[in-house]
């Protein structure tokens, strides 16, 4: 997160490619950074992207905006860490013009579409999210603290998104093939657990959330077909609906998956049609 202009790695100038949204019961707005990779590139032909950059789809020319040709901030050959400062959920207080937006890094870095926030029966804040790209994953964040409904705008409530556990979803087919039924598991993305440690190249919890895609690869999360909008049933805790846009690579050959070592280039895998992801059934296309 550290750059020459921000040696502390704590102050980021602006947001990129804000997509969907969310709202909190304490009166703030959540905006979602999505296709941030398209704004970066590099000018040095000798520059080579690393596995993290490839996994997030960063490329020499980006989306053709050419920002990197006029502003060194967006030239990865000059400021390699700058892309890591984008791809976050940003919390904004629209009712306080002096407030400073906060990138809630505990919620993970990926191509956020929206942020569906609910209060669980135990009082914890839960945020459901999808990474809007083919072969990517569904996530949820659960706060460490609980929501104080008696004082919704309290300072304690306003800090609930800074501390908690990020999870990624894995779906498994049921016992009967073709019945479109199955089970789901939320796997914690926590440094030191489930192989997210130094033996697999992870150095801290900060490293895990910056590399959320690669951490999810390591945990065997289920590849989805652009998990876009997420909505929760307010009358039935735990019931969540997810719209997936498309995946032209699903079912093509040769089949492949996002590799556990995190080296798969973004969007390049060819997942098979399977019962764990019934939306991919060809007869529903």
Regions from the language model: what does each represent?
Residues 9-20, 218-229:
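Signature of short aromatic-glycine-proline-rich micro-motifs recurring in repeat-based ectodomains
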Residues 17, 85, 111, 226, ...:
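Beta-rich catalytic cores
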Residues 28-29, 123-127, 237-241:
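Entry beta-strands of beta-propeller and related beta-repeat scaffolds
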Residues 34, 130-132, 245:
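Short loop/turn segments immediately following the C-termini of beta-strands
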Residues 37-80, 143-146, 246-273:
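Short, conserved, GDST-rich strand-edge loop motifs in beta-rich repeat architectures
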Residues 91, 134-221:
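Extended catalytic-interface subdomain
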Residues 282-285:
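Conserved small/polar residues in nucleotide/adenosyl-binding loops
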